[in-house]
Amino acid sequence: SVVDGWTTFR
């Protein structure tokens, strides 16, 4: 999901 990708980006 998009949120999952953002967590890794953060």
Swiss-Prot record:
Family statement: Belongs to the pectinesterase family.
Main location: secreted
A Gene Ontology BP annotation from the UniProt entry: pectin catabolic process
Protein keywords: Aspartyl esterase, Cell wall, Cell wall biogenesis/degradation, Hydrolase, Secreted
GO CC, any one term: extracellular region
Biochemical pathway: Glycan metabolism; pectin degradation; 2-dehydro-3-deoxy-D-gluconate from pectin: step 1/5
Catalysed reaction equations from the record: [(1->4)-alpha-D-galacturonosyl methyl ester](n) + n H2O = [(1->4)-alpha-D-galacturonosyl](n) + n methanol + n H(+)
EC number, UniProt record: 3.1.1.11
Record: residues binding substrate: T8
One of the record's GO molecular function terms: pectinesterase activity
Top-level taxon: Eukaryota
Localization in the cell: Secreted, Cell wall
Name of the protein in its database record: Pectinesterase
